[in-house]
Amino acid sequence: MSSAAAAAAGAAGGALYTNNNITNNNNNNSNNNNSNITSSSNLSPTAATIATTAAATTATALSGSISPGSRESASSLLSAAFGNLFGGSSGENVKRAVRATNEAGPGCHQWAAQSLDNAMLAAAMETATSADLLNAAGLVSSLNTSKLLNNVNNNNNNNTPLSNGNNNNNNNASISPGSAHSSTTKGGSSRRVSNCSDRSLDGNLAAAATTAATDAAGGSPPRAASVSSLNGGASTQTKQQQLQHDLMAHHMLRNILQGKKELMQLDQELRTAMQQQQQQQQQQQNHEKHQQELHSKLNNNTTTNNNNNVVSESINLIEDSEMPEIKIKSEPELMASATQAPHSPHGGSSNSSSSHSHNSSNNSIASNGSLRRKSSDSLDSMQREERATPATTVEPQLQNEVLPTKKEAVDDMLDEVELLGLSGHGHSRNSDLESLASPSHSDMLLLDNSKDEVLDNDDIIEDDEDDDDDDDDCIETKRESNTSGSNCLKKPGMELKRARVEHIVSSMRCSPSATAQAGQLQVNGCKKRKLYQPQQHAMERYVAAAAGLNFGLNLQSMMLDQEDSESNELESPQIQQKRVEKNALKSQLRSMQEQLAEMQQKYVQLCSRMEQESECQELDNEHEQDMDSMEQEQEQELEQEQEQEPEPLQQHNDDIELSHSPTLSKSTPKESSERAGSSSPYIEATEQQQLLRAAATMLLPPRPICSLQMMSKMMSSKLQHQHNPLVGVAHPALPQGFPPLLQHMGDMSHAAAMYQQFFFEQEARMAKEAAEQQQQQQQQQQQQQQQQQQQQQQQEQQRRYEQEQEQQRRMEEQQQQLHRQQQHLQQLQQQQQQMEHHVAAAVPRVQLHPPARLPTRMGGAAAAAAAAAHSVLKSELSEKFQMLRQHNSSSNSNNSSSNNNNSNNNSSMMRMSGTDLEGLADVLKSEITTSLSALVDTIVTRFVHQRRLFSKQADSVTAAAEQLNKDLMLASQILDRKSPRTKVVADRGLSGNSGHPGAQNGPTPATQSAAAMFQAPKTPQGMNPVAAAALYNSMASPFCLPPDQQQQQQQQQQAAQQQQQQAVQQQHQSAQQTQQQLEQNEALSLVVTPKKKRHKVTDTRITPRTVSRILASGWRCAAQWTGSCRSSCCRTTTTTTTTAAAAAATTTAAATEQQWQQQQQQQCNAGTEPNGSRPGRRHILSTATTTTTHDAGVFAHLSGHTKSIAARIQSLFAVQSILQSACGAGPHGPPHGGQPTAAQLHHQHHHQMQLSSSPPGSLGALMDSRDSPPLPHPPTMLHPALLAAAHHGGSPDYKTCLRAVMDAQDRQSECNSADMTFDGMQPTISFLKQQQQQQSQLSGAHSVPMVNLWSLAPTHTLGTNVETSWVETALTIITIYHTIYDIYTFSNHCESLTPLHSSTLTPMHLRKAKLMFFWVRYPSSAVLKMYFPDIKFNKNNTAQLVKWFSNFREFYYIQMEKYARQAVTEGIKTPDDLLIAGDSELYRVLNLHYNRNNHIEVPQNFRFVVEQTLREFFRAIQGGKDTEQSWKKSIYKIISRMDDPVPEYFKSPNFLEQLE
């Protein structure tokens, strides 16, 4: 930024020094002009006049011996060069400069070329801030003025040194602090912006133009002091003075961009300025006389005098102590007169000599605490304009003199700056030189009016914040640009400089305010803090400074390499050495600046850490204490420094010599530190106090902003303290000639020590806080541990308490169980006693007590309770069934005890039997175990005992028959209500069984059992009527037949098995036909809950196995009652018994005649001749069907609780007992010993087949105890086929066992099929096709089951009456059997399960469909029907199955898209990088969804399909196709072509059973 200003300054300097021979004609004008300026007392600065006079001054500088056209061209070129600095268009300025050069003529081409180059460089740097450019231009004019003044002094031959010194001092006093409204300082000290903002020119007073010439040209008032050498003409010390000039110029520029302006206590400056104005008038008179003698040949004096006398100055003071701004009134009418007045080329000398005097006057300003700011500004402007007149009197002397070279001019300027520092008493340097660096708003507005170019106010405000390092660029650039146009060197010019230095020194010694006001330096800045506003952007100034410094140095080297090469030839080795030292010092300065930046970073970190951790009130107190302590220390240091400063400074001013000091390059840290402390105590004290207080109040929420502001304030103040000593000469305590460039070391060390101390304090505080936090954390951790321990203890106590409670509960439960067991045992004993009592009293009280229920497998307690509960004969049937349900519920917990009870009861009953009943007992035992014959015998026996008490037997038999039919109908209705099936199915079953029960074409659709084995035995045609007499003791029994007859029986058994299989097939066909009528009318849900068979405790059905169990436990009691019946019957007459039996048989024969005929016809069709010698004997083979029941059955309930039925059919069996007694049949049956019969062998063989053909899962080991083979029993009179049916040979009980085992494995499993038809004889997996073929072959077969009542060869012949009564009795028994079978069949029909072919989809089908998804994703309906053969498909379930696969695909594609997008976000580039392994997450999710229990191994091709699908989705998403509407359709087409054939084992109907 500053490089552009340097370029412009070089252009201006070149123009001034190139035309060094054309400035002789305007000297007298300047003298008259200056004298006129001093006479004005009413000063009123205006913006337009200052801007116009600046342009005029530049034009006058170019005027001389050149023609008027060339003068105008040079003026326009310089205006173009500086016009680029004030916001104008760079292109227009360059073009304007080119045109002016072409019009100037050949005499000005050499200067124009160089000026044009500089102007173009300035145009390239138009981005620089206006503050930098204005400062640079001001310095250029200051340097030019110093050269001109030096030449004037040389011409005067040191005639008036004292007046020159006085003149400089007086002029310097006129530089007052500018208005404070343009910028404010940090820490409460206001910064001076410009002094030209308070000036305005009145009317036609054109002489004031010389005062503000360089203000307009440079953007700020010229404040650099051009002081000649202090050595009174000694030419031997010229080189040393040049070196000092270089150093002083460097320091001055640093102070320009860094210092802070003081806006207070300006009345002292005004008083000194008034005294110096009188001295200026005398000095101006002397100069006028001298110039008139030397330049009497000049012709332009009268014109300039007339023009200059017109100008008058006035200052309008605005007396407003509250407002910091100073309003400036511009008078546009002054512009015309100002622009017409030609100005002296040396008009800037007054400004250049102002810095020295201002230093001394500003010293008094700092020491005085008054606040009269407005008056001081006005008087400052008056003094400045009065100083301009004596300075211009010296300028005409330069006409006959040759200007010095670039080197000498710069050295002279540095000497003057050095003397300025000596006379400034230290602290005035800051405010003076600071005013050079910062023009105010009024300056900018004046320049805008003159140049007709607009400047941004923001750029002007930012001028105050420019970098402090741009001074290096400015000083070197201006120094070389000032001398760029001058190539000749003459030594006599140095004499004038020496004379001026002597006068300046004498004037400083005579100054009344130099020593008197030195002791008033100590000012408590904190009390004045309210007058200032903090500056907010100090950090940005320092950041921008480094860039400007480096760029300016590079630009300097680019522009002036040629001039340096020429000037280096004229320089002595000492000067070159000093230049090297100066460069070294610059490098040191840069390194220190870097260190300072590092310290700033550390401080920022420290502040951030402090802000994060200091949030408690303790930190506020600590900050306040630190602030107070540091303020006290600083105040003490300031007092000591201010006491030590005045005396050395005064002594040093008195002993100033121009000789080079041998200790120029020597310095000590102590001296530098003292120098640092004495730089600006007021600024340091006020800023540090404010910064410390700001740091103490930094605990507000926006902490980082506060910390940065505090840091910026501290760094700005420290940088000012660091660089302020570089302005002027060395500290008074230092040796004479000590290079001030090294003095900033003290400030750096002081700042570093301060920061280090503050850093250590912060570290200590942070360590303390960290220790406190650690202690708090430790305490919290201890508290948490204690709480956890307490919680654990509480939990342990609670656990112990719960354990104790559980133990107490267990103890109580055990005690309760023991108590219950004891009570139960007591009840059992009581029940046993009651049973014994009832059995003992059964014979004498047969009418009062109904037959007690036999002990069954359900338990003796239940049987005894049932016998006690049903003591009343005329109780309702509903009440009986209700009591039965209660007994069944209590029977499960009493199984073990009931078995023992049964044995006890049986043993007690056996003890009551006599020897005469042994034969009958054996026969009854063998018969009861396999059929209902024993039960019928028991009923008949009890009926005989009751019959003796009735007088009318015929009426009793008739009533019994009628009541039997009614009770059977009532029982069927009750069973219908308790069936879980729908009423429609029950009605169908009733209609199917209503006609002829034995003539059914097949079982109901839901029936999966073969024909029952409870059909009544019938005697074949041609049977001997007397054969019944030998029914129990005939040696022709099937088990006592010769071997040939046994072979025939075995053949009959095989035939019965074949017929049984045919009946099963016929049932399948019937079920299929019925299922065709049923159809699924609505769509199913996704998962259908399986309708499992209800295992109710109150189930009223009965199975053959249950009947066998019941009869096996109660055969002894029945046999005992039968024996007693026979003994009592022996005392009656045969005729009476026979008559009663015949009457009873006659009454019931009519009811069963039709059934008998049908059954006889079936026997004729299905029977075979076992022996050819007996043509009339035909054996009726019975078939067994598979049923699905296992609980206690209906018949046991009827036999135990329907007393009316039992009472009315007892008469039907009385004939049998009477015939046995009358015929004299032996009581003993076949012997127990001997070889096992064929039935027993078949039972053992079939049990092995059952275990071997059991499904996996150790079915044989898990079978219920009921399905174990029964106890060995004597041979029965039943056919072996009937025994085979009873012993698991296709019996319903076997299938019940199979389902019970499967339900025990997993009742809730979806994979258990309740539709299997395993009967123990066929393989586990059935083949539907073969079954259908067999069913079609046997479609006409009848499935009415029968029990063959074997007819054996009689050994005794009875009468006709006996034969008739036996036939009638047999018919009655057959009727009872058919009635019981109807009830049993109906119960099976009501509780049957789903048939083989069903239209209902179950959860097992859903699981199968999920597994099929591994092979096919888009199956057709034909494929689905092929792989679901057990489903009868219709439109509803087909759509349901298709919907399942649609849902499968939806889940599949959702997962694919999810993981594809995840892969895109993870940064995968190509689809080939996507690989699906067995342990990948996507593969695991899919397997968990479709193969939850790992039923099958996932095929390898499915992994390939998943991988391809994922890649397709990845390509689509990566290519951006997912934004389209139907972007997935193409992927669906690709995946649909990847289906594979499903394995064949999915077609198996048994596949669902294998899934678990």
From Swiss-Prot:
Places the protein is found: Nucleus
Biased amino acid composition, Low complexity: 150-180, 275-285, 299-309, 343-370, 814-834, 888-908, 1249-1260
GO cellular component: nucleus
Bias type Basic and acidic residues, positions: 286-296, 374-388, 802-813
Motif extent (Nuclear localization signal): 1090-1097
Domain annotation Prospero: ranges: 1457-1556
Region of interest called Disordered, as start-end residue ranges on this chain: 150-199, 212-243, 271-309, 336-404, 448-491, 562-583, 614-682, 802-838, 884-912, 979-1010, 1156-1179, 1224-1274
Swiss-Prot/TrEMBL GO biological process terms: cell development; nervous system development
Entry keyword set: Developmental protein, DNA-binding, Homeobox, Nucleus, Transcription, Transcription regulation
Single GO molecular function: DNA-binding transcription factor activity, RNA polymerase II-specific
Region Homeo-Prospero, residue ranges: 1398-1556
Main location group: nucleus
Domain notes: The Prospero-type homeodomain and the adjacent Prospero domain act as a single structural unit, the Homeo-Prospero domain.
Protein family per UniProt: Belongs to the Prospero homeodomain family.
Name assigned to this protein: Homeobox protein prospero
Organism per entry: Drosophila virilis
Lineage of source species: Eukaryota, Metazoa, Ecdysozoa, Arthropoda, Hexapoda
